[in-house]
């Protein structure tokens, strides 16, 4: 069976996901077969594996860092919020249905067999399992039925690294308080604490680190700097949305829907030096972009209502009539059509039908069975501004409940309005390049002035930079002693 180490945090967004990815990369570099694991993830950012299973993207990133194929066993339970008090529950990659939060909480321990089967299966195939917790083990109201933090650590007998975020302040209180709120048994599982997202001279921290070790009775296993790496990370969501880049040669506006999903679809465009990718949630902030993207969403009808009430729908329609390129992905694609109906209330109780934006000739009906599959092929029949996509390869995955009439192929278009069910459709560098070339031609600027790069080599380099920072920040001899159960 594999050795294991678990990374827990003092709070959400403490940097667990990225630290786990970095540790996966370090251990891979050191010659180990490594797999990530997170028993339960709550996220709208998901991925479809080769066998059609759905899992959280955080574990996909960690698998990529480890150099292995993503597998639903790495994230056996995925919760995708549908409302403020309920989620779609996905177990072993397959939808089990929608469930109110309290019902899931009551039934949570029923999912332990699925969690353990997934973990034990991975543990038979790999040398080391790097486990990520969720939220904080200090949520004492959730400890009784916990299956993702200390509850999971007990089930798989995992030693724990506790991570605190110094960038938001109060890291010593975070770490000490979290340790103090654990039972004696669980405190013994904490083998090291980590100060994460540090900026500055470590020498300034040293007195506090020594006091922290004395108070907690646990060694400081590292001080990891604030990482400036370009890796898709769930913890960077609020930071990503908060960006408002200064003007660049090409301006792309992504509509920030309330229930936006798979925001990483647009990451390829962020990597061009002279492309501005903005997230917009107010009509007055839309301005006059070169391209408007309506992203995927977990609640198409509710987010279309929001789009309408906010005034953004009218602004997008006006921009489209003026020739601006408009592109919808998945739920955003459905919104662009004539009509959406949900007769069985698959999304949520409430509205069963709604008129779409009327920019594409398609009608969508939500059905009980979810489409979740990887897909690839060659573009054909693409007209208008993006006609140069014809003959070029695409790859990605589909995750949606609705079926749309008149939607054929990977890309459906009418004039300057385009839509696709394929998440990751921009990931192939040739696809992103072709779209940007078309925008440059329309605007009369040089594509070469945007700055180009090798996307695959760039991604691998980012994982190596992450590993360099994690290796330098962590006490790796201590990490290996923890893995070998020597502390």
Predicted regions located by residue number:
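Flexible phosphate-sensing "switch/lid" loops adjacent to ATP/NTP-binding sites
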Residues: 1-320, 325, 345, 368-369, ...
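Catalytic nucleophile serine of serine hydrolases
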Residues: 330
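A conserved active-site-flanking secondary-structure segment within enzyme catalytic domains
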Residues: 337-391
